[in-house]
Amino acid sequence: MNGLKTPPEIGIQLPEAKVAAETGTMSGPLVPPRSDRSVRRGTDVAHVVLRFVCLLTSVIALSLMATAKEAASISIYGFLLPVSSKWSFSDSFEYLVGVSAAVAAHALLQLIISVSRLLRKSPVIPSRNHAWLIFAGDQAFAYAMLSAGSAASGVTNLNRTGIRHSPLPNFCKPLRSFCDHVAASIAFTFFSCFLLATSAILDVIWLSKY
């Protein structure tokens, strides 16, 4: 108009619009990819299954040890002597019962929390602080179960072999039911330790990814 040229239009993109164009959303948090959500869901289910199995094995270990008692007779130098055995007679067995009870309580608490979050379709591990807390608890209880099982194994081995160069015989022959209960309890104790260690490894994997 009047011989003046219209200046060319300059396209200006606001920072908000640019960010929205790059992220593909205008408001609200970013939605993780479907594959990432499925992986997290699978990890959450694995945590719940591990908690349930750990609760089951620790309760079985506790029950077997708490019911381990028997009375019988044994022959020493031709004399028939009455003997009786009970889990509370040994400090190692009492330690195993206490640790198994603590692990069962820990597993039950974590199972309730995990299942409630899973039913609400929320992450079982909501934050890194929560993951570190669970990792510390799993690792501590795994070491406790390992020490309890090892201590009880030493006492059980002594009951089975007796003492060398002494008249003390194999006490597990007359007290077979007692020794079987103790052996089964120790086996479930070590299995619970393995499950807790596996759960701690899953916690480390979660921390490395998220």
From Swiss-Prot:
Is this entry keyworded Transmembrane helix?
A: yes
Q: Which UniProt keywords apply?
A: Cell membrane, Glycoprotein, Membrane, Transmembrane, Transmembrane helix
Q: Does the keyword Ribonucleoprotein apply?
A: no
In this protein, the residues bearing a glycan are N159
Provide the Gene Ontology terms for cellular component.
plasma membrane
- Where in the cell? Cell membrane
Q: Which residues cross the membrane?
A: 45-65, 95-115, 131-151, 186-206
> Which residues are on the Cytoplasmic side of the membrane?
1-44, 116-130, 207-210
How does the record say this protein sits in the membrane?
A: Multi-pass membrane protein
- Which InterPro entries would you find in this protein's record? CASP/CASPL, CASP_dom
Per the record, what ranges lie on the membrane's Extracellular side? 66-94, 152-185
Chief place of localization: membrane
Query: Quaternary form?
Result: Homodimer and heterodimers.
Sequence similarity = Belongs to the Casparian strip membrane proteins (CASP) family.
Protein name per UniProt: CASP-like protein 3A1
Q: Specify the species.
A: Vitis vinifera
